[in-house]
Design a protein with these regions (language model features):
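Substrate/ligand-engaging "lid" and interaction regions
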Residues: 1-42, 46-339
Length: 339
């Protein structure tokens, strides 16, 4: 048993071993997603694979969605090259249930994976193509709080950021510079609306993403490296929004005991990879069952019905109330799961 499109053709063997498999036509979903993408996510890490990707899978299984996810990795390209591509973007999700049982799911909602690398001409051209699509509704991020910072611990501009300010959006080197360049491509395609949604677990995450993107828009406009209207586009809430979110999902690094459990089921090629950037990644993710994601409902190009997958949408003034409620609920849930 191998985790790949070919290996999953023998569905009976996987199901006999207790794995829940995708119930949708993945080839059809892949084709529709590539033609009319609605959601691209930056950050191919464990929380995305265990949470957002699984939510979309459930909605695909239920026929609520007809398109899947595209993921882009901008910090460690080897995650895509050594894990996503060899396994055809499939992941095994192992969930520890509140009653102590284990649930095993093959997640296949991610149908395309790319590196956010301006030196990879085909990948970056594809990213620009995605950003130019009318259908794109949301661009989401789990890149850690540090990923939004343009300065070092001393408050000095990071070298790549400083270089990007003067070189412009053609071939930026910094992570946020690349994202800003992609948003500029959407602006050039007709000032199309989109929600830029940080899903990192940090306070006022939407403001952090906005501040970083807006700084690039300001500097590029000052240096006459973009059209004069780009900064206004970034600051027009009818065109571009930066919703706040709150997220909680425990996804520790891939566990050796989980790996052994899967190997006993007969699954091959499960060995984790430690990349040159010291990222520890495996074909599987292990996670606790408890989770929540609350999103400020500010989507200028519309959004899918993600509330049917368990996500919560609210308005900014309701965040404090929901934060207290979700924290209490999650504390209760964790207390039960630890018994």
């Amino acid at each position: 048993m191998r985790l790949s499109a070919e290996g999953l053709k023998d569905r009976a063997k996987w199901e006999e071993a207790g794995y829940a498999l995708p119930k949708f036509d993945r080839e059809k979903v892949t084709e529709a997603t590539k033609e009319n993408p609605f959601w691209i996510h930056f950050g191919a890490g464990n929380i995305f694979r265990a949470f957002q990707a699984n939510v979309v899978q459930n909605l695909l299984n239920d026929g609520i969605l007809d398109r899947g996810l595209i993921v882009a990795e901008g910090f460690d390209y080897e995650i895509v090259e050594k894990m996503n591509h060899p396994h055809d973007d499939y992941t095994i999700l192992v969930t520890l249930k509140a009653d102590g049982n284990i649930e095993k799911t093959v997640v296949g909602s991610v149908v395309e994976s790319l590196t956010v690398n301006t030196e990879n001409a085909s990948d970056f051209a594809r990213l620009k193509e995605i950003f130019a699509k009318d259908s794109l509704q949301m661009v989401t991020f789990t890149i850690t709080e540090k990923g939004y910072s343009l300065v070092n611990g001393k408050g000095e501009l990071l070298p790549d950021v400083e270089a990007d300010f003067v070189s412009g959006p053609e071939a930026p080197k910094s992570y946020i510079g690349k994202v800003a360049a992609l948003l500029y491509a959407r602006y050039q395609a007709g000032e199309k609306p989109v929600a830029m949604v940080s899903m990192d677990n940090c306070s006022h995450n939407g403001d952090k993403l906005y501040a970083a993107i807006n700084t690039f828009a300001e500097k590029w406009e000052e240096n006459k490296l973009t059209d004069a209207g780009f900064r206004a586009y970034v600051n027009c809430k009818e065109k571009v929004t930066f919703p706040w979110t709150m997220i909680d999902k425990i996804t520790p690094r891939p566990d050796a005991s989980v790996e052994e459990l899967l190997k006993k089921d007969g699954i091959e090629e499960l060995d984790p990879v430690i990349t040159s950037k010291n990222t520890y990644v495996a074909p599987f993710v292990n996670a606790e069952e408890c989770e929540y994601l609350v999103i400020e409902d500010a989507f200028p190009n519309g959004r899918p019905e993600l509330e049917k997958g368990g996500l919560m949408f609210t308005y900014l003034q309701s965040f404090d109330i929901i934060l207290r409620e979700t924290n209490n609920e999650n504390h209760y849930c964790r207390s039960r799961s630890s018994r």
